Amino acid sequence: MRITEEQELILGSLQCERLSSNIDNFRLVDDFYNGRNPSIVNTLQNEAYEDDANHRVAYYVVKNNSGEILFYFSLKCGLLYDEFLEGDRLLDMKAFYEHIFQLSKDPSLQGTDKDAVNAILEKARTKKGLKKLEVARALHLSLDSEELLKIFGENNKNVGITFAGVEIVHFCANEAHRDFWNQTGIQQKLGTVVFWQFIVPKILDLMEIVGCEYLFLFAADLSEDADLVNYYVDNLEFIDASEHSAATPMYDFACRFLCQETSTLQERRTSFFEHFNPDEEV
C-alpha cells in the first residue's frame, strides 16, 4: 500500500540541512551515538563541520521537528572505471596516448585517417574510453597485433572508460534518538526513508546540471552473513557490481563496492512510496 497522508506529514516534518549551514549543529552533534560505528560518529563530531564548510565532503543532518539529529550522511563526487589500470598497463596506455598525439600533428595525415586519430584523442580527453576495433582501423592494425595487446589485454574490447558518479561516504543513524522513529509506527527503517526521501532527490537535482551515471558506496561489512551489504541491496537497491571499479582510498580496501545506475532513480523512488507499506497489502 502506498504511503498514507499521516505518514507523509511525518516525513514532511523532518528537516535535512547541510551541517555547516547552521552553527547550532556544531553543538547538536555532541549527543550523536552509534555503538556499532564509533569511528563514523567521531568523524561527525570532530572533522565533518570543517570538511563541510570547506566543500571537501558535503555533510547533511536529518532532524525531527524538535531539532534533534536523527541521522547523518555525506556525499562527494567520484569516478568509476571499467578497469583500473596500473603498472605496465598504465605506462603502455600513457605511451599510446603520446604516440596518438604526435601522430595527430603529422602533416602527412589527411582525410578520414586524420579524423579517426582526432576522434581517438577526443575520447581519451573526455574519458569516454577506447574501442579496440576503432583503434585498429585508425592505425591500420590487426586486432591481434602486439600493439593492441599491450593496450587492451587479452579479452578487452574497450579500455579507459570512466563513469561520473556520486559516493555516499557516510550513512549513519543516531541511536540516542531511535525512539522517535520507533514511535512513528512506520515500518520502513529510518535509513531507507532518508535515502529515498532526501538523498535521491539531491542526486536527481545534481543530474540537471552535471553528468552523473552512478551512485556508489563502500560497505564496511566483513561479516559472514553480510547484513550491511544485504541491507543496501534489499532496501536501497544497490548491486554488487564487479564490472566497475573506483579510485579506492586506503581505508576502503576492506569494504565491498556497491553501486546503482542513476537513470532509473526517479521511477524507483516513485515505486518506493507507492509500496511504502508492503506488509499491509492483501
Sequence positions of predicted segments:
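Non-catalytic substrate-recognition and accessory regions of acyl/acetyltransferase enzymes
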Residues: 1-187, 194, 201-282
